[in-house]
Regions:
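Basic polycationic patches enriched in arginine
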Residues: 17-18
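Structural preference for solvent-exposed beta-strand-turn elements
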Residues: 141-143, 152
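Helix N-cap motif at beta-to-alpha junctions
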Residues: 90-93, 149-154
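A short linear hydrophobic-aromatic micro-motif
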Residues: 73, 132-137
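Regulatory modules associated with amino-acid/nitrogen control
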Residues: 32-126, 161, 166-167
Length: 169
């Protein structure tokens, strides 16, 4: 029974290519390549980054047990050796009585940047630093996300838009 199951899931074509659930491995590789490929050209990344300010206030907090939180309310979490850092909406942190000391705005760069792209973080972090703005960056699968102090949100957007416009000229 196990062999029949294995043969139905994974077969070998006459060309020697694997077939998984009826899809040729070449198709799967092309699909994954297209899905995985984001932009790597720095000048294109900068001029096309399209920063977007998300609604709401976000905070960084830490918890010992992530299971105590509703994961639908967690924007992201990262397991550190001390505890688990979570980024969540400020309102939810207040409801859960979590302590925080940094209220941030969330800016998403709407270009699909490759995780292998070189220089994008340095470029926008440098532009923000020149304007005296601290940033905390999360590189996710499709986009880069920037957290800046809530009080710096408008100034950060202006700085990012200026960087992008300068790259377009």
């Amino acid at each position: 029974l196990l062999c029949l199951l294995a043969n139905s899931l994974l077969a070998v074509c006459s060309a020697g290519r694997r077939v998984v659930h009826g899809f040729d491995s070449g198709f799967i590789e092309q699909f994954n390549e297209k899905k995985m490929s984001g932009e790597t050209n720095l000048s294109i990344l900068i001029k096309s980054m399209q920063p977007m300010l998300q609604e709401g206030d976000y905070v960084f907090a830490s918890v010992k047990d992530i299971k105590l939180l509703n994961l639908d309310e967690v924007l992201f979490y990262f397991r550190e050796k001390e505890e688990i850092t979570v980024v969540i909406k400020r309102e939810y942190a207040d409801v859960m009585q979590l302590s925080y000391n940094y209220i941030s705005a969330w800016i998403t760069l709407n270009i699909h940047s490759s995780l292998e792209a070189v220089g994008l973080t340095a470029a926008f972090a440098g532009a923000l630093a020149q304007d005296g703005i601290s940033c905390n960056v999360v590189a996710a699968f499709y986009h880069d996300h920037i957290f800046v102090a809530r009080t710096d949100a408008v100034k950060a957007m202006e700085s990012l838009l200026k960087l992008s416009a300068k790259s377009n000229s």
